Regions:
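Extended acidic/polar, glycine-enriched regions
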Residues: 1-48
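Compositionally biased, low-complexity repeat tracts
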Residues: 20, 28, 35-38, 65, ...
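Acidic, mature catalytic/reactive cores of soluble proteins
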Residues: 26-27, 112, 355, 362
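Catalytic cores of extracellular degradative/oxidative enzymes
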Residues: 46-322, 329, 346, 353
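Extended polysaccharide-engagement surfaces of secreted carbohydrate-active enzymes
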Residues: 313, 324-369
Length: 369
């Protein structure tokens, strides 16, 4: 493709055109300054390379180990799965690693499947078995790791439930819908209704329950979501602290969640509350002429906690920057009829955020964390 970069001076705007023919970093310079672009093979192609790498290299195979079937961190320098997390919970087989299962299930629901179907289905079934039998207790309390249990962390529940609901939609197996609702009920029992989860599965959860014919449970879950949404509306800009005192991944999930509950109910209180949060969210976005800092959230601490060497910038940008894209995307959907111009701008920003976050995927399918 051809990139067009605008350099704005006091007197004029200079547009530099650069044809991107190779993958990797591309510098576009003008009068002592420059923009940093990234050439990739293609958005979908890069995602599919990542999916194939996960299938080929990141599912643990050891029946004697409780982590058998888990998607785990891959050491790109050691060229192997990282089996020793060195006591660092951010490197274990639970927690954020659930995102690999969600990614695969979400891909399975897409229109085109280029990744091997038999291998794909088997991997997901093995992973679902691992999650239910090793990462959860019978009552759906959810662990952070399969060996010692780790911290009972509220964030884990929404991710596991999202995975189950996507599996229900993908396979038509009602048990996955039951597992999804069971996991969310466990979340509410233990953490109440005021926890600011990342990725409350509003849309996927309601759709999965409806598809499974679980209409009563669907209405119950919607009421649970509304109860949480009411608390978020009441709190407004007084965001509670969680693992970090104040951060993008508290605000962005709240905006996304309120927008999805608005879409499910039509109650404008929820959309109004989301609108009031947007300036706080936008204040945490970079707008620099670099693919690492354009529509990317400021998350310097995660570049330390998640990096291999625990040096600030190890992970740059951090993948949770993409939560803002989900928030912008849902907000754009909500205002599409009332303000098409603003909706188009938020959708553009959402897509830019996702594109730039794709720099965490390499052309051979590996990733930075």
């Amino acid at each position: 493709e051809t990139a067009h970069v605008d350099f704005i001076t006091k007197k004029s705007t200079k547009t530099i055109t650069r044809k991107i023919t190779d993958t990797g970093e591309q510098h576009v310079a003008y009068k002592g300054t420059h923009a940093l672009l990234l050439g990739i093979s293609g958005e979908r192609q890069l995602i599919e390379k990542r999916l194939q790498f996960i299938l080929d290299h990141q599912q643990y195979n050891n029946p004697a180990d409780p982590r058998d079937g888990a998607f785990m961190i891959y050491d790109c320098e050691g060229d192997s799965i990282l089996t020793d997390d060195h006591g660092r919970s951010d490197l274990d087989e639970g927690r954020e690693r659930i995102g690999m299962g969600i990614l695969l299930a979400a891909y399975g629901l897409s229109e085109e499947l280029r990744v091997k179907s038999e291998e794909f289905a088997t991997a997901l079934e093995r992973y679902a078995k691992f999650v239910r039998e090793k990462l959860q207790y019978p009552d759906y309390r959810t662990k952070s790791d399969a060996r010692q249990g780790g911290k009972n962390r509220g964030y884990n529940y929404a991710w596991v439930a999202d995975f189950y609901f996507r599996m229900a939609l993908l396979t038509g197996n009602k048990q996955y819908a039951l597992d999804g609702i069971g996991t969310l009920r466990s979340l509410y029992r233990q953490f109440g209704y005021g926890f600011y989860c990342i990725d409350y599965p509003v849309t996927t959860g309601l759709k999965a329950l409806e598809q499974a014919g679980m209409n009563f449970e669907c209405q119950q879950l919607l009421q649970d979501f509304c109860t949480t949404a009411d608390i978020l509306v009441k709190n407004g800009l007084n965001f509670p602290k969680f693992e970090v005192n104040y951060e993008q991944s508290i605000i962005a999930p709240a905006v996304q969640f309120l927008c999805e509950v608005y879409q499910a109910t039509g109650n404008k209180r929820y959309l109004t509350a989301a609108q009031k949060m947007l300036p706080a969210l936008e204040a945490l976005q970079w707008h620099q002429p670099s693919y690492r800092m354009n529509e990317i959230a400021i998350r310097h601490w995660d570049g330390y906690w998640f990096g291999k060497r625990q040096i600030y910038g190890d992970v740059y940008p951090h993948y949770w920057s993409a939560i803002t894209a989900a928030a912008y995307h849902r907000y754009a959907q909500c205002i599409a009829d009332s303000d098409a111009k603003a909706a188009a701008d938020y959708q553009r920003r959402a897509e830019q955020c996702v594109r730039d976050t794709l720099c965490l995927f390499y052309e051979d399918g590996r990733a930075t964390c």
